[in-house]
A protein has these predicted regions:
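Gram-negative bacterial Sec-dependent N-terminal signal peptides
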Residues: 1-18
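Mature extracellular/passenger domains of Gram-negative fimbrial/pilin and adhesin proteins
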Residues: 14-180
Length: 180
């Protein structure tokens, strides 16, 4: 019995330790000359416009505007009082180029008779390259801009006289924020 216990004890003490896992972690970003940082998830915004019936877009109709935001953090303002956000993208040939081209996600072709409008929170649309100005929200105690700011926008589809193409769509723009 003593020998059996010694043998079992030997097996227990020589049990192997499972090998660990190894990997790497990459940390990246950009340091910019700016009073604020864009919240990381807002660098690549995705705005789901939903399913839009073609009937609302006929005869120069518009879809229901979809609100979206860009969030800023770690803001330190000196004398700045406004932020201007400029969206740029391909101007649509529909509606005299006042809006953005939308593309069929299956074929890559531009949609006919419909385009994307981007505007301020009140629903005023802005052409590609035109700045949308918003006031910096101040902290009442310091009378300086708050460390967190939210930029509010809306996007909607604008039809033409004729019926729009049908299918899944996307429009891609870039945006830049300047501080004055």
């Amino acid at each position: 019995a003593i020998a059996a216990t010694m043998v079992m004890g030997a097996f227990a003490s020589t049990s192997t330790i499972a090998a660990g896992n190894n990997g790497t972690a990459r940390f990246y970003g950009t340091i910019e000359d700016s009073p604020c940082s864009i919240v990381p998830d807002d660098h690549k915004l995705e705005v789901d416009m939903g399913d839009i019936g073609s009937g609302i877009l006929k005869n120069n109709g518009t879809s229901t505007p979809k609100a979206f935001q860009i969030h800023l953090q770690d803001c330190v303002f000196d004398t700045q009082t406004t932020m201007t956000t400029t969206f740029t993208g391909n101007a649509s040939s529909t509606n005299s180029g006042n809006y953005y081209t939308i593309y069929n996600t299956d074929t890559g072709a531009a949609f006919n008779n419909v385009s994307l409008a981007i505007g301020d929170a009140q629903g005023t649309s802005y052409k590609s390259g035109a700045g949308i100005e918003q006031k910096i929200v101040n902290d009442t105690a310091t009378n300086k801009g708050k460390a967190k700011q939210t930029l509010d926008f809306k996007a909607w589809l604008v039809g033409a006289a004729d019926a729009p193409d049908l299918g899944n769509f996307e429009a891609n723009t870039t945006f830049q924020i300047t501080y004055l």
